[in-house]
Amino acid sequence: MCTDTIPVLAYVKIELFFADICYYQRINPKPITDMAKKIAEQLIDTLAESGVERIYAVTGDSLNEVNEAVRKNNKIKWIHVRHEETGAYAAAAEAQLTGRSGCCAGSSGPGHVHLINGLYDAQRSGAPVIAIASTIPSREFGTEYFQETNTIKLFNDCSYYNEVATTPKQFPRMFQSAIQTAITRKGVAVVGLPGDLAKASAVSVDSSVRNYFTRPEVCPSEEDLILLADLLNSHERIT
């Protein structure tokens, strides 16, 4: 091989190498990190866009970032209650009275346990409620950390959606799923939010995070209506 062609071949290989990198980046785009916005702020923005106007909560250490995000956002009010149970009941009542999603929050440990009664009421009443269960730092999971609770086990029976956020990239789509579930199924959606994730930089995603405000209705068939009418008409005393 002529030595004059070696630099040319090396140049071609380098060009092909960078072309491969560019192609890979096009089909595997990196998420865009918004260094100016935290996950907690992204959470509050998403709630506001879905029509939530108030968060009923008791301030706690793991909820500090969410509390601060509410302060910066002028679309949502932080309603400080004396007990998380009261906050959960208030969120359920607001959802039933207004038709919009209610929202409550509780910090790790007692704050989670106190939400239970109100969330059961919302779930059984068909009230769309989003519960933010802020948790201990994710690096402390499974270490018997102070006031650690297993939110999946704790809220599983009183919710249609119950997951724990783990990464900034996952959070936007996950939170949208939680809100959409509460709206569509008219019940409780619980989102576990580790304290360290709440203060992490937010990430934009390519997939849609829009919520759709559907109003599903159950309509019995004509045959069932006729059967019910005949049953009622064939008896003199109906309770």
Put a short name on every predicted segment.
Residues 34-239:
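N-terminal alpha/beta PP-like core and its mobile active-site loop of ThDP/TPP-dependent enzymes
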